[in-house]
Swiss-Prot record:
Belongs to the plant self-incompatibility (S1) protein family. The lineage of its organism: Eukaryota, Viridiplantae, Streptophyta, Embryophyta, Tracheophyta. GO terms for cellular component: extracellular region. Residues 1-27 form the signal peptide. It holds the Pfam family Self-incomp_S1. The keyword Signal applies. It is found in: Secreted. InterPro entries: Self-incomp_S1. It comes from the Eukaryota. Keywords: Secreted, Self-incompatibility, Signal. One of its GO terms (biological process) is rejection of self pollen. This is S-protein homolog 13.
Length: 160
C-alpha cells in the first residue's frame, strides 16, 4: 500500500512539473535588418555586424541597405541552464552603438518580453538615426502581417 502511494505521488509530481515548467528548448529566431536610407553613398549606408553566442561565433557580416540576416537556433530554457544569449557589435557609416556589445537575444524572460508577442523572435533594425528593437505588438492572427513598433535603443556615436 505504501509503495503504491509513493509511486502515485511520484507520477503526480512528474506530471505537475511537465505542465508547470516551461519547455526546456524552444526555437529561437534573430533577425538583423539594414534600413539605413537617404544616404548618397552606398558605402556609408552599409552595416557591419559581428555576432556570437555562448557557443558559436557567427563572424562578421556586411549588410547593404534593405538586406537582412536571419539566424534560427534552439534555445535552452530550463533553470538553471537558461544560457542561450546572442551578442553583437555594429558599425555603420554613422558610427557605432553606445555600448560596444549589444545583447540581441536572451532566453531570460525580462529580455524576451521586450521583443514582444511570443518573445521567441527578436528583430533589430539599423536606421539612419540609430539602432532599434522592432517590438512585435500584435501577432497577425488571421492577418498574416505582424504589427510592430520600433523602439530606439541606441543612437549612432563616434568612438574612433
Amino acid at each position: 500500500m505504501g509503495r503504491d502511494l509513493g509511486w502515485c505521488f511520484f507520477v503526480a509530481t512528474v506530471l505537475l512539473a511537465a505542465v508547470l515548467l516551461p519547455a526546456p528548448t524552444i526555437a529561437g529566431r534573430l533577425e538583423l535588418k539594414n534600413e539605413i536610407s537617404g544616404v548618397a553613398s552606398v558605402r556609408k549606408a552599409k552595416l557591419a555586424v559581428r555576432c556570437w553566442s555562448n557557443e558559436d561565433d557567427l563572424g562578421w557580416n556586411m549588410l547593404k541597405p534593405k538586406q537582412s540576416r536571419i539566424w534560427k537556433f534552439t534555445t535552452m530554457n530550463m533553470w538553471p541552464f537558461q544560457k542561450t544569449e546572442f551578442r553583437c557589435q555594429f558599425r555603420s557609416g554613422f558610427g557605432t552603438t553606445n555600448e560596444d556589445v549589444v545583447t540581441v537575444f536572451s532566453v531570460k524572460d525580462g529580455f524576451r518580453k521586450q521583443c514582444g508577442v511570443g518573445g521567441d523572435e527578436c528583430f533589430w533594425v539599423a536606421k539612419r538615426d540609430g539602432f532599434y528593437l522592432r517590438r512585435i505588438v500584435k501577432d497577425g492572427g488571421g492577418d498574416s502581417r505582424k504589427k510592430y513598433v520600433d523602439v530606439l535603443k541606441s543612437k549612432w556615436v563616434w568612438k574612433w
